[in-house]
Amino acid sequence: MCPEQPHDTRAERDEMSEQTQQAAQPAETAAYDVRAIQDKWLPVWERLDPFRADDSSPREKKYALTMFPYPSGDLHMGHAEVTALHDVVARYWWQRGYEVLNPMGWDSFGLPAENAAIRNDEHPATYTYANIETQYESFKRYAVSFDWSRRLHTSDPEYYRWTQWLFLKFRERGLAYRKSSPVNWCPNDQTVLANEQVVDGRCERCGAEVTKRELTQWYFKITDYAQELLDRLDDLEPTWPARVVTAQRNWIGRSEGAHVDFVVDGRDEPITVYTTRPDTIFGTTFMVVAVDSPLAAELVTDAQRPAFEAYREEIRKETEIERLSTDRPKTGVDLGVTATNPVTGTQIPVWATDYVLADYGTGAVMGVPGGDQRDWEFATEMGLDIVRTTQTPEGFDGEAYHGEGPAINSPAPGADAPLDINGLPVDEAKRATIEFLEQQGTGAGAVNFRLRDWLLSRQRYWGVPIPIIHCDACGEVAVPYDQLPLELPELRGADLKPKGVSPLAAAEEWVNVACPECGGAATRDSDTMDTFVDSSWYFLRYCSPDYTEGPFDVEKAKAWMPADIYVGGVEHAVLHLLYARFFTKVLRDMGMLEVDEPFAAQLNQGIVINQGKKMSKSLGNGVSLGDQLAEFGVDAVRVTLVFAGPPEDDIDWADVSPAGALRFLQRAWRLSGDVTSEAGTPAAGGDVALRRVTARTVHDAAELIESYRFNVMVARVMELVNATRKAIDGAPGPADPAVREATETVAILLSLVAPYVAEEMWERLGHEPTVARVGWPEVDPALLVEEQVTAVVQIQGKVRARLEVAPDISEADLEQLAMADPAVVRAIDGRPVRKVIVRAPKLVNVVV
């Protein structure tokens, strides 16, 4: 299946709109009790349990995965959309004869539960598990084909035992480590944030302005896998949404350039900077160092220290977004030292500034004002030299120029330098400069990544405790594996209020322990893990949720993985999806997985909006899923969401009609009561025209589902309902076997989007439940061969006649037939024919 399919054409949308109107017109009044049908079939499905995946089944396996929800309140319209779309695929695979794993669980650690516990003076588990049960009952009523035997919650100790186990295994491989560094700090939630959780300088969760704080934190070394994470995106490109692949490529941010060593007065070790344009080194007229970096504090002279410290305090009050703003004046302080340009040998000043960040490389950047706009502005502000090293295009009237062109001033005319790259294009100039640096031992070619290691420590309570003990004598000591899970102590209400350190730090009985190695006094690590750690492997636990010997049964994971489709929002493109890919690769290298990627294909749904805007309480445009289900029923809401448009498009609830969907379902349901032939009657002797419509619908539905054009699939079912109603009310009548075949096909196809009405139809047609597992309708290939097609005859571009012809008619015969048609003869009206263009069997174009 491939998500990258073209959207429906305007003609298709118009056709679908027409079909909706036709299918929604009831031919008669009939009793159709939505609530009674739902109440009838839900307990039957619970008893039959038709969607329990059998690990030992000999059938080919499919893994249908949707992103598990956070348990905050009941399900909303977004949940309804994603699960309705996802369920089309899962139910389709069951009908096609696959053994399908379609599990569900809850991402149940996180801040909302902790904040609710503070407000309500309770334990976070109270809020969490109450909401889980509410959502669980709603999912069941919504009739999603989940295998509930595999249900999991990431906040259960039997789950997070294995999250802790994985952390320790990563640590043993050098992939989990602790360091002190400036981190993103949310002053509202009083916790650190990973780079990916900062959007435009603000906390993605609460919107507070993010500040920097120096803390010792735990990290996952995701950068060890940066190149592979990037390279394997090529494999995912055919089956993942293009915008997700692009977002991950940009986030990983691979660039090729060079490390260049600058010797600084009074310092034994050179300062190494990374640049993507080593060819511009002749234009390096200064060096800038992040003002809040340890390097700046080390380099500053005593004479400049007062000015430096005052400037540093001023900058510490600024947010990262303010520091990186392109429209603010550049500021800085001369550190009073110079560095030596390794190519020209000239001395250049070293400045501290706010527009370089401490966590970028070494925190130092070579200033090339002729090729970088920020450097240009800084040099202009501080009165520093500006030297262009790349020839600008004719007519260029800008400031810094970073584009292509021959090297100039490299070296400057008359200058004596050991390297001359003047006249070389950029790529050749870069190579020549790197070769020189490597020969001189003052630099080397290098690859750099924008991706930074994953900061996973959080200073909150409701998360996975980090299984590390700190001992003055032994250092960091892992909690022994046989003592996992390390469970959270019982804290509630005011005990959880943010204090800048984790609430666990105040749980003295829990935090103070004996060192497992020496037996001396020690303390537990009081931070908890980022909840994205929990969700980076949950899809593997689904393969064997009750397994007690490891995080998952390796053999069962081998049978089910990778997930064949993963459905969820695009907002997780560079967070959850990147982290899950990282975990999969580490587990593969540990010998626990055989796959390189966790998700073979991915589908991103749009969002449900209302009146052209995202739903919000402040705008008063919210739509309650519960109200919609109560008024129109589950099936009508599901059909509305699936039929609204391509899955990746947003749905404006003001523009769709659950009432129209309900009328369509009533019309489909009536068919099952009007069929008079017995169940099991062979269809072979039935009306051929209707059988052709049925066969074509089944054939098209399969292709449309596999290309994620679910909305068009629903339109085809609407067409079949109309054709069947016409056959019942006219010829060949309700007793014709083709009418039964068509109606049974409607029920099977509707089981993918409207399971309640489909089950009711199936029973009324004389069958036992469940229609969801009867199998895909078989199609006689002969019925797909058209007996006649319509050929259009145009004269001067205007349609003058339509002819019913055989699909294999020759161009000569079609031309002869068209030219003899009375309407064509009248339209030509004796004028000489200049040209006849024939495209058999569909078109004849006459030019007079």
Curated annotation (Swiss-Prot):
Keywords carried by this UniProt record: Aminoacyl-tRNA synthetase, ATP-binding, Cytoplasm, Ligase, Nucleotide-binding, Protein biosynthesis
ATP-binding found in the keyword field: yes
EC number: 6.1.1.4
GO biological process, one term: leucyl-tRNA aminoacylation
Residue interval(s) of motif 'KMSKS' region: 614-618
Main subcellular location: cytoplasm
Compositional bias segments (type: Basic and acidic residues): 1-16
Domain of life: Bacteria
NCBIfam families assigned: leuS_bact
Family membership noted in the UniProt record: Belongs to the class-I aminoacyl-tRNA synthetase family.
Name listed for the protein in its UniProt record: Leucine--tRNA ligase
Top-level taxonomy: Bacteria, Bacillati, Actinomycetota, Actinomycetes, Propionibacteriales
Gene: leuS
